[in-house]
Amino acid sequence: MKLSPLILELINAFKVLPGVGPKSAQRMAFHLLERNRSGALQLSQVLHNAMEHVGHCKQCRTFTESELCEICAHPRRSEAGTLCVVESPQDVVAIEQTAEFKGLYFVLMGHLSPIDGIGPSEIGLDELANLLDSKDLTEVILATNPTVEGEATAHYIGQMCSARDIQATRLAHGMPVGGELEYVDGNTLTHAFVGRRSLS
């Protein structure tokens, strides 16, 4: 059976989502057409509103509907003197859920990757430099992912901090809580040994 152009267009639209292949996209499209047209219309409206009204915070670059996000607008956050640098807005959400960090964030929207043509300007390091110069910071926490690119990005930002006499720290890596030693990969185990701390 040949699908109509509109159905094909709907299926292709779903394929822009991460992890959604042709079969999953087709299943989603057919589900909405068969069983949930009102839900589809609501999804369409909410999606349109989000694309129209959600932008980036002018200070930290996370998603917000205002000029400044709720965190950057909070006076106590600025007074903390700490900045946490992350790769994505999802990382901000994850850290906020711990309720451990009370400072400001800067969202890179990626990491350095010269092979892919992503250099310092593509991830906003000029904006980060301005933030480092304008804020009274005592510590910058580098919470980039523990990948080759994430480590390279952390190293680069660490040098930016060092040039300004700001302490740069890296999130600890190692054993997951509740994990069993035999299932931990060698790289993670190495990080766990290097980052071990005294109990006394």
UniProtKB/Swiss-Prot annotation:
Residue spans, zinc finger C4-type: 57-72
Name of the protein described by the UniProt record: Recombination protein RecR
Gene Ontology MF term list: DNA binding; zinc ion binding
PROSITE patterns, per the entry: RECR (PS01300), TOPRIM (PS50880)
UniProt-listed NCBIfam families: recR
SMART domains in the record: TOPRIM
Role of this protein: May play a role in DNA repair. It seems to be involved in an RecBC-independent recombinational process of DNA repair. It may act with RecF and RecO.
Lineage start: Bacteria, Pseudomonadati, Pseudomonadota, Gammaproteobacteria, Alteromonadales
Family, as annotated: Belongs to the RecR family.
GO-annotated biological processes: DNA recombination; DNA repair
All residue ranges annotated as the Toprim domain in the record: 81-176
Organism: Pseudoalteromonas atlantica (strain T6c / ATCC BAA-1087)
Encoding gene (name): recR
Keyword Metal-binding: yes
CDD domains xref list: TOPRIM_recR
Keywords per UniProt: DNA damage, DNA recombination, DNA repair, Metal-binding, Zinc, Zinc-finger
Superkingdom of source: Bacteria
Entries under SUPFAM superfamilies matching the protein: Recombination protein RecR (SSF111304)
Keyword Protein transport: no
